[in-house]
């Protein structure tokens, strides 16, 4: 099938659901944020946020993974101080004015799709804000809270942290970040998080395909992985559905890690977003799977050939040209 036919004749399939982990943010901004501030991962967060002296003052070994260190904290005052510093650091991060992978992800999906992130950083939210008038964007959800958002528990609305509820005009309340504990009690922490996980179960159960980007499924997230797996198989044994993994880990390790999600081995992996289904068939990813799978018709790829790779305006203009055909459906 020629690319023009795919672009100009979009179909309404079930959702393409994207799950983001810390690796997605690192891939998006490998050299740091707009101000060159380094993106912390769990294995270097103590060093990047400069928690070493604070931990040593309380006779806690600062070396090792933040998940392990945080799980051993017993001093509530120390825990609050660490949480405050973590929040302040992530809240200070910002997107550059140039194109990032976050812009590409959002503009490559449609309103029928969804993005779920475990990340505390503001990049998904900020990318959504600057692209929301370009084309209909996917729904976005923050499974571990986020530094940019607040919520109204009365009306179940959420938005920018400093904003007000569009329904009752109350100022949004802060949403706490979920820290790396083995038992997170997703449905008991706060209303926004509980609703986000209910949404995750619904979207994963209905998904036509899933992309998992930079999420390592750590030990502290086994509760999350199990919830998502149950949702994925809730309505189907997934004999035909496809999962794509974007990660720098070798394919054999990825296949082993995500094998419970792919009983029929409909699985592909790439280390680069530009090789992904999202980028090769922007806003038509489900079509690119459906026609070969059901009719034996291969679909010509059409990755955007941008003259200036980092020009956000050019990316937005190109995606708008693809999206205009969706209005006719």
Predicted regions: what they are:
Residues 142-191:
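Cys/His-rich short segments
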Residues 1-124, 133, 318:
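Gly/serine-rich nucleotide phosphate-binding loop at the start of the catalytic core
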Residues 131-142:
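A short alpha->loop->secondary-structure connector
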Residues 31-32, 128-129, 154-155, 224-225, ...:
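Short coil/turn segments at secondary-structure boundaries
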Residues 23-26, 31-33, 120-124, 146-149, ...:
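Short, solvent-exposed loop/turn segments at secondary-structure junctions
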Residues 1-5, 95-101, 184-202:
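A Trp-anchored, charged/polar loop motif used as the substrate-binding/catalytic surface
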Residues 1-20, 26-28, 199-329:
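SIR2/sirtuin-family catalytic core signature
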Residues 49-54, 141-150, 157, 235-258:
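Short, flexible loop segments at boundaries between secondary-structure elements
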């Amino acid at each position: 099938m020629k690319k023009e036919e795919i672009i100009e004749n979009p179909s309404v399939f079930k959702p393409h659901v994207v799950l983001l982990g810390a690796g997605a943010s690192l891939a998006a901004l490998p050299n740091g944020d707009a101000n060159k501030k380094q993106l912390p991962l769990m294995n270097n967060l103590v060093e990047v946020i400069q928690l070493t002296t604070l931990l040593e003052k309380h006779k806690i070994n600062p070396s090792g993974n933040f998940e392990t260190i945080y799980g051993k904290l017993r001093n509530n005052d120390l825990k609050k101080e660490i949480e405050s510093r973590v929040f302040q650091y992530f809240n200070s991060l910002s997107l550059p004015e140039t194109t990032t992978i976050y812009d590409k992800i959002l503009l490559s999906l449609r309103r029928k799709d969804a993005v779920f992130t475990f990340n505390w950083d503001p990049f998904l939210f900020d990318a959504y804000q600057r692209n929301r008038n370009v084309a209909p964007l996917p729904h976005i959800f923050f499974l571990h809270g986020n530094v940019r958002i607040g919520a109204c528990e009365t009306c179940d609305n959420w938005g920018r942290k400093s904003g007000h509820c569009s329904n009752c005009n109350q100022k949004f309340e802060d949403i706490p970040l979920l820290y790396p504990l083995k038992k997170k009690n997703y449905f008991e922490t706060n209303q926004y998080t509980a609703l986000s996980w209910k949404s995750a179960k619904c979207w994963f159960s209905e998904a036509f395909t899933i992309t998992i980007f930079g999420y390592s499924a750590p030990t502290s997230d086994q509760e999350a992985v199990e919830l998502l797996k149950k949702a994925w198989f809730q309505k189907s044994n997934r004999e035909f559905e496809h999962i794509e993994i974007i990660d720098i880990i070798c394919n054999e390790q990825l296949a082993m890690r995500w094998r419970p999600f792919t009983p029929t081995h409909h699985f592909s992996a790439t280390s680069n977003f530009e090789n992904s289904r999202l980028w090769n068939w922007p806003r038509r990813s489900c079509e690119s799977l459906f026609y070969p799978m059901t009719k034996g018709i291969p679909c010509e790829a059409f990755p955007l050939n941008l003259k200036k790779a980092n020009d956000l305006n050019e990316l937005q203009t190109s995606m708008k040209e693809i999206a205009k055909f969706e209005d006719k459906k």
